Design a protein with these regions (language model features):
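Helix-start (N-cap) detector for alpha-helical repeat units in TPR-like alpha-solenoids
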Residues: 43, 77-78, 111-112, 145
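Register position in tetratricopeptide repeats
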Residues: 55-56, 89-90, 123-124
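Canonical positions in the second alpha-helix
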Residues: 68-69, 102-103, 136-137
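Alpha-helical segment of the N-proximal tetratricopeptide repeat
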Residues: 41-72
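Structural marker of alpha-solenoid helical repeat scaffolds
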Residues: 72, 106, 139-140
Length: 272
């Protein structure tokens, strides 16, 4: 039975692994008390209040606070970026894009803005723009600023499934012993994580599969396993598949797994 090391992420901005808005790092523990490092502009107490609201899983209050800052200081990079973050958590994709693109215009060299643009474009259904930003993040991870190189991955998307929320994480390199490519964290409305779904392709299984499917393996395909871990310790092997680790195809499989294997008390239907 497989078990990967969990990254205990809080409800706002994937708090326990945050290196910046929607990027995963190694030593971050929460939303900082001041505007994110590298972001210009001082929003005063209202900006701090909004960040506290994000940390407390109150994105609507946070968005209101950031919008108040932007009324008097529309070019505040931090407020625009954090307003986009709050809009992503509220599944308001077009609004998230509006604020993230404004932040990028004001501070085009800041890689953390691109991590937010990925989730914003995903929420707005803008797949071409989303994938452009994903490719850019991979380039910056290899050649960019130190925090970009230290990050392990980033949030691709937040999407609702019933009353719950799913945070979809993509890793720059397969993570851990079992080579996790994607991780989907399922959260209750209060932000509590109730399930983790990992998309993995470990070398042992891959070797056996490649021996049986040499042509596919030579073309770069792999065998993957989708495994769920509930917070009560139960593990479910949902399915196996072979091919490329395409996010959109995997998302469909994960949503189907959540619908087919609901947790007690959850409302799994209705994912979009």
């Amino acid at each position: 039975m497989r078990r990967s090391a969990r990254c205990g992420m809080g409800s706002a901005l994937l708090l326990a692994c945050l290196a910046g808005p929607f990027s995963l790092g190694q030593a971050q523990t929460g939303v900082p008390p001041n505007p994110p490092v590298g972001l210009s502009g001082a929003g005063g107490p209202t900006l701090a209040q909004g960040m506290a609201a994000l940390k407390d899983n109150q994105p609507r209050d946070a968005l209101n606070d950031f919008q108040r800052v932007l009324v008097s200081d529309p070019n505040n990079v931090a407020a625009n970026l954090l307003a986009s973050t709050a809009a992503v958590e509220l599944f308001q994709g077009p609004l998230a894009v509006q604020y993230a693109e404004k932040a990028e215009k004001l501070d085009p060299e800041n890689w953390k803005i691109h991590t937010t643009l990925v989730a914003a474009y995903a929420g707005a259904g803008m797949k071409q723009q989303r994938d452009h930003e994903r490719a850019l993040l991979r380039e910056l991870h290899g050649t960019g600023a130190p925090d970009a190189r230290l990050a392990t991955g980033f949030l691709v998307e937040m999407f609702p499934i019933g009353a719950d929320r799913v945070d979809a994480i993509e890793y720059f390199e397969p993570l851990g012993r079992f080579h996790t490519y994607y991780r989907f964290l399922v959260r209750q409305p209060d932000g509590k994580r109730i399930r983790e779904i990992d998309v993995q392709s470990d070398d042992f299984d891959q070797k056996s599969w490649a021996d049986a499917h040499p042509a596919e393996a030579a073309a770069g395909d792999r065998q993957f396993q989708i495994t769920g871990h509930a917070d009560d310790g139960n593990t479910v092997d949902y399915r196996m598949f072979s091919g490329k680790p395409d996010y959109d195809n995997i998302r469909v499989m994960v949503v189907e797994a959540l619908r087919s294997h609901p947790l007690p008390g959850s409302q799994p239907a209705g994912a979009r």
